[in-house]
Regions:
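Core nucleotide-handling region used for phosphoryl-transfer chemistry
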Residues: 1-307
Length: 307
């Protein structure tokens, strides 16, 4: 029943990967990943944070109660729809971005998972489900059908996408949002059709490798991925999950906070940055190997010489 939302990748987007499906570009909201569905066997709505099922006492800042109130007057069609799908979205509570007061404590649906097929549904069906359930959604900035991706100028498409990063009508100061999400218009296999995010510098979870001043290989590789943005992301998750409280965020509680976030911080880097880390290791090896090989071969030349 529980389905954890698949990671949105922060690198590797290639427009050519979507020429058969098309793409959509939507606002990425700075809230808590959450979901809900209807369990027909148990005859109840089940509500989840990113990592666990929620209850009255573990509610993700009121999301559990919000959903129960939201669905209490659902008709038969809406219940049947919710039985087939898990609805994913963002529960908007205060994190880093400052939104208008009226935007908070609302759920913005951004994806629909078909529980029978194990796939995320198409853009068209997703909008139908959202309409049936009367759900709010993040702003959709643009869509490109497959034929448009083939016909339109690639650089203009990419330029238009980049211009959307940070746009928001919900932020207190206009257009100071977190970023955008790019995903396929078609049915999506969680294992083979990832979504991508582009965020503003404020939310970038890595530092440019060229900006680093490494004192050694390990420091260089670790430092590029250890950022305040990534740390804040993990801390906010722990607050949402009630592992930490606002009162815990004090220097006198350093040990508790460190113990709560360290493993998730490490796992997040390993999951999101492993490809880049391996790439940098290979690059480093490629640079250092000649320094070993050259003197070795020079020595062999001397051994074979007459003098």
């Amino acid at each position: 029943m529980y389905k954890k939302y698949d990671k949105i990748l922060n690198k590797g987007f290639q427009l050519s990967d979507f020429v058969e499906t098309g793409i959509e570009v939507t606002e990425k909201l700075d809230g808590s990943n959450a979901s809900f569905t209807y369990d027909a066997d148990a005859k109840k709505v089940r509500v989840f944070s990113r990592n666990q099922e929620l209850t009255e006492n573990n509610s993700l800042n009121g999301f559990y109660q919000y959903v129960q109130e939201f669905v209490k007057d659902f008709n038969d069609l809406q219940i049947a729809t919710l039985s087939d799908y898990t609805i994913f979205g963002e529960w908007l509570t205060k994190h880093t971005v400052t939104y208008k007061d009226e935007a908070y404590n609302k759920f913005y649906a951004f994806d629909v998972f078909n529980k029978k097929s194990g796939y995320y549904v198409s853009h068209r069906l997703r909008l139908e489900v959202f309409s049936t359930l009367q759900l709010k959604t993040p702003e959709e900035f643009m869509t490109f059908e497959p034929d448009e991706l083939l016909i339109l100028n690639k650089e203009k498409i990419l330029s238009g996408i980049k211009e959307c990063v940070g746009k928001s009508n919900l932020t207190l100061i206009p257009n100071t949002g977190e970023g955008i999400v790019i995903k396929s218009l078609g049915v999506r296999d969680p294992d083979n059709n990832p979504s991508y995010k582009l965020v503003t510098d404020r939310f970038r979870e890595t530092k440019g490798l060229k900006q680093q001043k490494p004192t050694g290989l390990q420091v260089h590789l670790v430092d590029y991925a250890i950022t305040e943005a990534r740390m804040k992301k993990i801390i906010f998750k722990k607050l949402d999950e009630q592992v930490l409280t606002e009162e815990d965020l004090s220097l006198q509680n350093f040990g508790k906070v460190m113990g709560s976030v360290a493993k998730d911080f490490q796992d997040d880097i390993i999951e999101e940055e492993m490809d880049e880390i391996i790439k940098q290791i290979r690059k480093r090896i490629g640079k250092q190997l000649p320094n070993l090989l050259r003197p070795f071969l020079e020595e062999k030349d001397r051994e074979m010489g007459d003098l």
